[in-house]
Amino acid sequence: MSGYTPDEKLRLQQLRELRRRWLKDQELSPREPLLPPRRVWPMEQFWNKFLQDGAPWKNVIYKTYRHSIFAVTHVLIPVWIIHYYLKYHVTAKPYTVVERKPRIFPGDTILXTGEVIPLIEGFPXQPS
């Protein structure tokens, strides 16, 4: 016996028809796809209206605005954060280690002012 039985032929014909209908259903109508309205932020809405006429000076203003936003968000704020971290968390803090001040003896000179400490009258073991 060669070939398909009548039941197999009918089944294959129905599968082909089903495939054709499925492929036809996949074609989009001119109204599809229906996209939801896009939400626009207030600043974006402002710039869209501002740039509508396409004047060159408006493009320059917009580009300056965009570059300044980039500079603030990608340069200034990270630099401030790094500066804060280095200033308050990494550098050695003053007055954390308490040391005695060096002793001052009669006849010594104070470096900051150049003042000479006077000799004490009647103090034993002073060079004369």
From Swiss-Prot:
InterPro entries: NADH_DH_b-subcmplx_su6. It is a single-pass membrane protein. The modification N6-acetyllysine is found at K24. The chain crosses the membrane at residues 64-86. One of its GO terms (biological process) is mitochondrial electron transport, NADH to ubiquinone. It is found in: Mitochondrion inner membrane. Belongs to the complex I NDUFB6 subunit family. Complex I is composed of 45 different subunits. This is NADH dehydrogenase [ubiquinone] 1 beta subcomplex subunit 6. The lineage of its organism: Eukaryota, Metazoa, Chordata, Craniata, Vertebrata.
